[in-house]
Amino acid sequence: MRRPRHKTGITLAALGALWASAVCADIPAARQTELMHLLTQDCGSCHGLTRKGGLGPALTQAALAGKPAVMLREVILHGRPGTPMPPWKSFLNEQEADWLVQVLLEGKTDAH
């Protein structure tokens, strides 16, 4: 029996909301502020301070729409060999990378 598409979409949205709340729940506010600074300054040095692109591609909500969160986390942590995108795993753990992915996918511009 096939599941109606709208129910699948609702289920995926609910799972995404649960994932997002779980990611935020365990990162202290002070670290979230540090991560936003890293996103703005370090990532922004290549992707643009407003995330609209530069040396690296845009990191806007629209530009990342449809990209799997797991893939984005892997790029953040491990970089992209053969490109200027460096790995950030020395500075971030998986949970922090997931938090950054959430911020990017939601188009947030501040930590809170």
Short names for language-model regions:
Residues 1-6:
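N-terminal secretory signal peptides that target proteins for export/translocation
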